[in-house]
Amino acid sequence: MSSAFDWRAKAACRDKDPELFFPVGNTGAAYQQIEEAKAVCRTCKVIDACLKCALDTNQDYGVWGGLSEDERRALKRRAMRARRSQAMQMQI
């Protein structure tokens, strides 16, 4: 049976300290930590699956799929606006 998390066995982060991907805050030292986590993500073969999982399961914290918490929130907002715009155009 396949799981939504099967991709994790191939993830570049699998042997890294998980705390690297969950900084506290988003400025100063936390910003540097976010950038270090993203650098690991950039080398990952399953970055897209990771991001999809984070979005599908509403992961609000940490770096997933190469995106920070703020970046994923912005991505969700853009997607929501695009869906609304498309729905409004279909009503016209």
Curated annotation (Swiss-Prot):
Its cofactor is [4Fe-4S] cluster. The keyword Repeat does not apply. Its main location: cytoplasm. Pfam families: Whib. The Fe-S cluster can be nitrosylated by nitric oxide (NO). It is found in: Cytoplasm. Induction: Low level expression in exponential phase it increases about 8-fold by late stationary phase. Induced by heat (45 degrees Celsius) osmotic and oxidative stress, nutrient starvation, tetracycline, and bile salts. Keywords: 4Fe-4S, Cytoplasm, Disulfide bond, DNA-binding, Iron, Iron-sulfur, Metal-binding, Transcription, Transcription regulation. One of its GO terms (molecular function) is protein-disulfide reductase [NAD(P)H] activity. GO terms for biological process: cell redox homeostasis; negative regulation of DNA-templated transcription. The keyword Manganese does not apply. [4Fe-4S] cluster binds at residues 13, 41, 44, 50. Binds 1 [4Fe-4S] cluster per subunit. Following nitrosylation of the [4Fe-4S] cluster binds 1 [4Fe-8(NO)] cluster per subunit. One of its GO terms (cellular component) is cytoplasm. Residues 12-74 form the 4Fe-4S Wbl-type domain. Belongs to the WhiB family. Acts as a transcriptional regulator. Probably redox-responsive. The apo- but not holo-form probably binds DNA. PANTHER family: TRANSCRIPTIONAL REGULATOR WHIB1, TRANSCRIPTIONAL REGULATOR WHID-RELATED. This is Transcriptional regulator WhiB1.
